[in-house]
């Protein structure tokens, strides 16, 4: 199973490269990561609700090069929510992950780490 299309609450989610090894020594794949995030979603989503995320992506697995991403990519599905944060030189449209579809889309983007910022759509969290 290398590709899969799933409908989550009316949102079409295209999952790809599911057999790609993310943890080679353990034999764990992207499909394992997606299932993990699906399993923990009820516990994780309340903590990152309405918070802009800084993502750490590992496109070649945990042993490959990783990079941080703040800006929502142009190719993101239209249903992925963003929140503009004004910085000195530009505006960054951070991803907001409030639902399972977005969480699994992030996992499909090889986003192993998600770091919630200390701001939310309503303002600064105190």
Label each region the model flagged.
Residues 2-7, 11-125:
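Active-site loop/lid in soluble adenylation, ligation, and acyl-transfer enzymes
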């Amino acid at each position: 199973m290398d590709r899969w299309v799933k409908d989550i609450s009316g949102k079409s989610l295209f999952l790809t490269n599911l057999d790609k090894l993310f943890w080679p020594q353990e034999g764990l794949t992207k499909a394992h990561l997606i299932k993990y995030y699906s399993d923990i979603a009820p516990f994780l989503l309340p903590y990152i609700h309405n918070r802009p995320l800084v993502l750490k992506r590992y496109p070649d697995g945990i042993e490959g090069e990783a990079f941080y991403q703040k800006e929502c990519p142009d190719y993101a599905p239209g249903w992925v929510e963003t929140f503009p944060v004004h910085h000195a030189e530009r505006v960054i449209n951070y991803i907001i992950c409030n639902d399972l579809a977005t969480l699994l889309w992030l996992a499909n983007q090889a986003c192993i780490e998600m770091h919630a910022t200390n701001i939310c759509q309503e303002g600064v969290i105190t």
